[in-house]
C-alpha cells in the first residue's frame, strides 16, 4: 500500500466534500521518494480521526492539519490533529483568513450600499482586513468610477477596480492578492466572483451564470468553499454568494466596526462613555456621514431584536 504511518506532515484543508477533507501538502516534505512524479504540492483525500469528533474539534477549509497514514500512490491519508486558528470567518466558514476581498459590481446588479456594508461588517466583526474589488467597471463611465473610489475612500476602505473584459486592474489585483496568505473572495451573487477567479487562474475553469434580468441579481453558482493557488504561496477562496449577511454584534461595539466612525472617535471623545451615537448630548459622531442612517437603523434592530445582538 506504500503507507507511511510514522510520518506526520502538515497540510492545509482546501475543500470539504461529504465526509472527506481535501488536504494539500508539499511534496518536498515526503520521506518516500518512490513517487517523485508527484512534483510540488499535491492534494490528498482524507478522513479524520474519530478522536477529533469526540473532542468537538470542527475542521473547516483553511485549517492547518496534521496528516498521517499517507497512501502516496492513491493520494489518501488520515487527519490526526488540527492546529489553533489565527482567524476565523463564520460565513462563509473559512479558517486562517488574512484578507477578505469583497466583490461589488459597478453595474448589473446595481450597487447596494446596505448590502456592501454588511459584507464589510462581516470582515470587521472577525477582525480581518477587508478589501473592496469593484467589478464590471467597463459598464460605467470614468466619472462614475471616480465617484465609487471616493465613496469607498470616505468609508475608510481601499478599492481595486477591475474588468475581466479588458483586463483593467487585473495585474494590480494579482499583485495585492499575492502579498497575503489566504484571501476569501466574498460578495453577493452575480457580481462576477467566479468569472474573476477564472480570469485570475485560467486553469480552474469554474462554471458561471448570468444576472437574472427579472430579479436584477445573480444566481448561486458556487456551492462550496474551495482554495486555489494564485502564486507566491498565496491561496484564494471561492465562496458561495449570499445577498444579506447577518450582523451579530453588541450595540456598544457596533460603531467601532465603521472605519469612518473609528477615525472620529480616535480624535475626540463623546461626553458619555456609554454613548451609542444616537441622540445623546455631546456625541462626536458626524450624523451627516453617508453610512450613519445605516448604522442607526441596524443599531435599533440590535437593541430591539429577540435574538442576542443581531440585526437583519
Curated annotation (Swiss-Prot):
SUPFAM superfamilies from the UniProt entry: P-loop containing nucleoside triphosphate hydrolases
Top-level taxon in the UniProt lineage: Bacteria
Subcellular location as annotated: Cytoplasm
EC number annotated for this UniProt entry: 3.6.1.-
GO terms of molecular function: GTP binding; GTPase activity; metal ion binding; rRNA binding
Family, similarity comment: Belongs to the TRAFAC class YlqF/YawG GTPase family. RsgA subfamily.
NCBIfam families for the chain: ribosome small subunit-dependent GTPase A (TIGR00157)
Role of this protein: One of several proteins that assist in the late maturation steps of the functional core of the 30S ribosomal subunit. Helps release RbfA from mature subunits. May play a role in the assembly of ribosomal proteins into the subunit. Circularly permuted GTPase that catalyzes slow GTP hydrolysis, GTPase activity is stimulated by the 30S ribosomal subunit.
Name this polypeptide is given: Small ribosomal subunit biogenesis GTPase RsgA
Amino acid at each position: 500500500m506504500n503507507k507511511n504511518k510514522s510520518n506526520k506532515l502538515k497540510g492545509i484543508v482546501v475543500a470539504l466534500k461529504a465526509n472527506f477533507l481535501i488536504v494539500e501538502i508539499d511534496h518536498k516534505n515526503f520521506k518516500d521518494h518512490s513517487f517523485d512524479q508527484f512534483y510540488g504540492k499535491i492534494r490528498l483525500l482524507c478522513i479524520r480521526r474519530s478522536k477529533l469528533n469526540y473532542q468537538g474539534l470542527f475542521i473547516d477549509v483553511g485549517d492547518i492539519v496534521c496528516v498521517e497514514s499517507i497512501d502516496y500512490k492513491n493520494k489518501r491519508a488520515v487527519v490526526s490533529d488540527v492546529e489553533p486558528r489565527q482567524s476565523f470567518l463564520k460565513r462563509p466558514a473559512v479558517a486562517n483568513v488574512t484578507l477578505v476581498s469583497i466583490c461589488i459590481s459597478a453595474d448589473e446588479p446595481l450597487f447596494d450600499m446596505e448590502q456592501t456594508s454588511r459584507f464589510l461588517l462581516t470582515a470587521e466583526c472577525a477582525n480581518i482586513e477587508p478589501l473592496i474589488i469593484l467589478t464590471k467597471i467597463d459598464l460605467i463611465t470614468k466619472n462614475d468610477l471616480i465617484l465609487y473610489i471616493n465613496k469607498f475612500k470616505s468609508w475608510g476602505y481601499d478599492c481595486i477596480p477591475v474588468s475581466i473584459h479588458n483586463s483593467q486592474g487585473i495585474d494590480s489585483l494579482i499583485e495585492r492578492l499575492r502579498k497575503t496568505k489566504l484571501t476569501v473572495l466574498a460578495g453577493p451573487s452575480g457580481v462576477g466572483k467566479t468569472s474573476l477567479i477564472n480570469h485570475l487562474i485560467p486553469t480552474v475553469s469554474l462554471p458561471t451564470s448570468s444576472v437574472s434580468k427579472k430579479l436584477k441579481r445573480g444566481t448561486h453558482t458556487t456551492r462550496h468553499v474551495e482554495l486555489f493557488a494564485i502564486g507566491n504561496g498565496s491561496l484564494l477562496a471561492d465562496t458561495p454568494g449570499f445577498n444579506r449577511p447577518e450582523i451579530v454584534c453588541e450595540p456598544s461595539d457596533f460603531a467601532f466596526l465603521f472605519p469612518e466612525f473609528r477615525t472620529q472617535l480616535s480624535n475626540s471623545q463623546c461626553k458619555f462613555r456609554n454613548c451609542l451615537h444616537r441622540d445623546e448630548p455631546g456625541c462626536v459622531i458626524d450624523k451627516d456621514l453617508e453610512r450613519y442612517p445605516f448604522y442607526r437603523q441596524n443599531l435599533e434592530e440590535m437593541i430591539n431584536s429577540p435574538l442576542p445582538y443581531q440585526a437583519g
